[in-house]
Amino acid sequence: MSSEPSSAAPESTIPRRIALSLQYEGSAFCGWQRQRNGNSVQAQLEAAIEQLDPYRPIQTFAAGRTDTGVHAAGQVVHFDCGDRIPPAKWAPALNGRLPFTIRVRESVLRPKDWHACYSATYRRYRYTIHNGRRPNLFLAPWSWHRYQLRLDESRMRDALNGMLGLHDFSAFMRAGSRRAHARTTVQEVDLVRQGDMVRVEIQASGFLYGMVRLLIAQLVAVGEHRLSVQDFEQRWRQRRRHEVREAAPGHGLCLLRAGYEQEIFTRAGWYDCQPWFFLAESDPPPDPPPLPEASGSEL
């Protein structure tokens, strides 16, 4: 009697949880999370995993749910799979099946009770602003071009420093959030100018839906003297969400990394990912006339 080839899944004696250090260029994606009619990073990644482990349903979990157009240098993702593929081999195998705009830096084995989102102790985001007079094609996908005035970094730092600690940030939470509360702890803030580029970094235990983009738009208003530092602080402390309307564009935002009690990767995915354009000098001479300084009036 002839035997038919079996389509059953091969035996897997040890279910495994794999963690990935992930980078993606967010311009072509509707965000991390799978959507019915959108091209998401999650959908692309799960499709690639299913090609390698087609015998079980695949579900991925991420440290941060980035929005449309937002980039990631150190996103962390986990999924459960069988033991046919060694943990370290998942990274090269997935890179051979993913679009070039998504790269897996490293893949490691984690305990079954470890979770990419719930085990994280912090996330760190960077927002990049191009504050030069002339637009630059090669900066456009990675930064927000604001050129009306030279940003006042001193005022912006004052506004940022007031946010440190545990607070209710519901003024910086977009409608549609599923969170039960809006309290989170801002652990570190940093603002650096290098030539025409201004970099803002914020590290927190967690972020609300749309928080960074809403915050950055208000911060730029402070830097352009359209909003006082005091009014900025009153808006979020008094939860005046109706006064926070504008959001900064997604393409200037990057998830730098997620942190855990113990470092899980042998090389951090974000370590050698300093954007090349942030290190560049301003336009070569002859320099254009300087931008006008922001006036002291508050609008």
UniProtKB/Swiss-Prot annotation:
Entry's EC annotation: 5.4.99.12
SUPFAM superfamilies in the cross-refs: Pseudouridine synthase
RNA-binding among keywords: no
Keyword annotations: Isomerase, tRNA processing
Active site residues according to the UniProt entry: 67
GO biological process, one term: tRNA pseudouridine synthesis
NCBIfam families per record: hisT_truA
Subunit structure: Homodimer.
Official protein name in the record: tRNA pseudouridine synthase A
Gene: truA
